A protein has these predicted regions:
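Hydrophobic core of transmembrane alpha-helices in multi-pass small-molecule transporters
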Residues: 36, 104, 116-131, 257, ...
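Extracytoplasmic gate region of multi-pass secondary transporters
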Residues: 45-49, 241-300, 389
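Intracellular juxtamembrane helix-capping segments at the cytosolic ends
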Residues: 52, 131-145, 353-366
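Interfacial helix-cap and linker-helix signal at transmembrane-aqueous boundaries
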Residues: 52-53, 84-85, 166, 170-178, ...
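Conserved MFS/SLC helix-loop-helix module at the cytosolic interface between two early adjacent transmembrane helices
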Residues: 76-115, 307, 313
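Cytoplasmic helix-loop-helix junction between adjacent transmembrane helices
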Residues: 121-158
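Helix-loop-helix hairpin linking two adjacent transmembrane segments in secondary transporters
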Residues: 156-208
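C-terminal transmembrane helical hairpin of 12-TM major facilitator-type secondary transporters
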Residues: 284, 290-296, 302, 307-361
Length: 438
């Protein structure tokens, strides 16, 4: 479907050696853009919820359920995408995902019934964006960096915040002036524009251009996953089976389930609608999310720096604790300008700040070879939590007429996750790595 990953682009890069080892940061920049656009795609249903409701008369719980399907498949695709990147190549996997994302989004312009929404924005965009997620960042970090991994993962995790920062005000303005169709068009074009950028600038791995990982010596040999030599599907499931027999996996899975439940599942999907119930317009509510995005960009980058230096378990405890208190505060805030700014700052600082310490704990427990795939399954837990919250929030709104109880429950689960984080122990490997093929 796509040209071999080392011809001709990697040959040209190898001949010119642009930036030396620092070319790793060029790759990070391109992947950051991919993650940013994927975050914009995943945040679009929050802006489209009211326009779709007004345009088609669809109930909010139905629209929320479609968004939840997309979030769920986004997460479940991740671990298979991580193994597929090892089996057929990162470039091919990423390019195919961008094609699916752009195509399914554009196809939704023709939708007239709820099942069309489920197919385009639920199934296909969920699967397509699943490979352009945290597992992609984890794979890039392990392939391209020997040092500064926490900082780089923090930067790439912050792309979710930047996606909100860049896309939400734009698509909210488009939705307010023209309905849901301009939003769909903008997302489809932005996704399609990344395809040639990835093809031109992202080699398969440092060795493809005659380099080693950033911060590594010339004789560095990066770890290779067994998925690159065998059945990637079997390896992905076998890694899950082995990881599921360990306590540390379930602690990480549970806390990341709560992370998804309390971020893109509830706040990302329902905050704009919650603000609408309180008399705040879509553009103003999107501006609030953008402000949160600014502080998350700061908080997640700082979290990556802190993860390289401090106990990640304690960091997670602090992050989840602050998040829980913020969510409990919001329903009682009065939704004044000052109170919403306070919420945006406190909540925004740790929106995605949990990713760098969670990845470090996964790599410490399961190793560099299995770590990204295990992390993919942990991210699946995140998205199961997010999908649950997306559907739960819409159902609570239909049953009670407001979102207050949904946000209070989410806050309490975050505080529980803070306590669980302190129980995680990665002082010894969770299981022995599989033998590496010769």
């Amino acid at each position: 479907m796509f040209p071999p990953c080392n011809v001709p682009v990697s040959n040209m890069i190898a001949q010119s050696h642009p930036f030396g080892q620092r070319y790793a940061f060029v790759v990070v920049g391109v992947i950051f853009l991919c993650l940013l656009v994927a975050a914009g795609l995943r945040s679009a249903p929050a802006v489209m919820m009211l326009p779709l409701e007004n345009s088609f008369g669809w109930r909010r719980d139905i629209i929320s359920l479609a968004a939840g399907v997309g979030i769920l498949l986004y997460g479940l695709t991740g671990p298979f995408a991580a193994a597929l990147m090892e089996r057929i190549g990162l470039r091919r996997t990423l390019l195919a995902s961008l094609v699916v994302m752009s195509g399914s989004t554009a196809l939704s312009l023709l939708m007239t019934k709820p099942w069309h929404l489920f197919i385009t924005w639920g199934v296909f965009s969920g699967i397509g964006s699943g490979a352009v997620a945290s597992v992609l960042g984890a794979t890039i970090v392990n392939r391209w960096f020997k040092t500064n991994r926490g900082l780089v993962m923090g930067l790439m995790s912050a792309s979710s915040a930047s996606g909100m920062l860049v896309f939400l005000p734009l698509i909210a303005a488009l939705a307010q002036s023209g309905g849901w169709q301009p939003v769909v068009t903008a997302v489809a074009i932005a996704t399609a524009a990344l395809i040639p950028v990835v093809w031109l600038l992202v080699p398969e791995r440092p060795a493809s251009i005659g380099m080693v990982r950033y911060g590594a010596e010339a004789d560095d040999v990066p770890p290779t996953s067994p998925a690159s030599q065998g059945n990637f599907l079997a390896h992905t499931l076998n890694t899950l089976r082995r990881a599921a027999g360990t306590r540390v996996f379930w602690y990480l899975f549970a806390t990341f389930f709560v992370c998804g439940f309390t971020t893109n599942g509830l706040v990302g999907t329902h905050l704009i609608a919650f603000c609408g119930d309180m008399g705040i317009g879509e553009v103003q509510a999107a501006g609030l999310l953008s402000m949160m995005g600014i502080f998350d960009l700061i908080g997640t980058t700082l979290s990556g720096w802190l993860t390289d230096r401090y106990d990640p378990r304690k960091l997670l405890g602090v992050y989840y604790g602050i998040r829980g208190l913020s969510l409990i505060y919001l329903p009682y805030s009065g939704f004044s300008a000052t109170s919403l700014i306070i919420f945006a700052v406190l909540y925004g600082l740790d929106w995605i700040a949990t990713v760098p310490p969670t990845l470090r704990l996964a790599n410490e427990a399961f190793g560099d070879r299995s770590g990204p795939i295990v992390f993919g399954w942990i991210v699946a837990g995140h998205q199961i939590g997010a999908a649950t919250a997306a559907a739960f929030g819409g159902t609570m709104r239909e049953l009670q007429g407001n979102y207050e109880l949904a946000f209070l429950i989410a806050g309490m689960t975050a505080i529980a996750a803070a306590c669980i984080s302190l129980l995680i122990n990665t002082s010894k490997p969770a299981f022995e790595p599989e033998p590496q093929a010769a």
